[in-house]
Amino acid sequence: MTDTKEKILTTALHLFAQDGYEAVSVSDIAGKLGMTKSALYKHFRNKRDILDSIVDRMYQADSKSSQEHGVPAEKYDSAPDSYQDVSPESVKEFTVAQFRFWTEDPFAADFRRMLTLEQYRSAEMAKLYGSCVAEGPVAYMEDIFREMISRGTLISADPRRLALEYYSPFFLLVSVSDRSEKSQLDILTEYIGDFFRRYSPAHREES
């Protein structure tokens, strides 16, 4: 991606995160960059093309992070075998990496803020918010935990309940990170360590 296209994407997303996607025009984006609309159109067809490129970039980043940390990059229905050998350590590392990504990466943080704003204005954005930030991660963890339970890595329990219990603190701490100068990562790291200890077969035997 050229430097100009990158600047257009990051500037547009920052404006979307501040004012909402619908409220920002191509003229606003071009003006912020000090370029004409015609110059911007050399790189993107329209505002929707910019948004689609932003979403594609986020999905690519998520897939790359999944592969780097040894967790599935696709949904369970598409690649069930990739869920069979996921370790608790891989899930922990991926969770920490995702927390850093959503809170420390400016592009990801702006994407999350944009979705938070737009979920109440657009059914499409609400669906995207659910897929990226809410229901999607819960369903993903449910599938991982179901496989862990089936092979005895975790004790027998309702995988949906475990997914909700695991993801809820993550969701909350990501949300409050925008308003807190103190890092929430230590709290999350301690929690996920406790979670896997609590639901490990070894812990049940000790109890």
Language-model segments: what does each one mean?
Residues 1-4:
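Short, Lys/Arg-enriched anionic-surface-contact patches
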Residues 7, 11, 15-57:
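Helix-turn-helix
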Residues 9, 52, 92, 96, ...:
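An amphipathic alpha-helix signature
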Residues 56-63, 69-70:
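Short, basic, alpha-helical segments at the C-terminal edge of helix-turn-helix-like DNA-binding modules
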Residues 66-108, 162-163:
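Hydrophobic alpha-helical connector segments
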Residues 80-82, 96-104, 112-120, 194-199:
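Helix-loop "lid/cap" segments that line or gate small-molecule binding pockets
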Residues 103-116, 120-150:
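Amphipathic alpha-helical packing segments from all-alpha helical-bundle domains
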Residues 127, 131, 135, 145-194, ...:
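Hydrophobic/aromatic-rich alpha-helical bundle segments in the mid-to-C-terminal region
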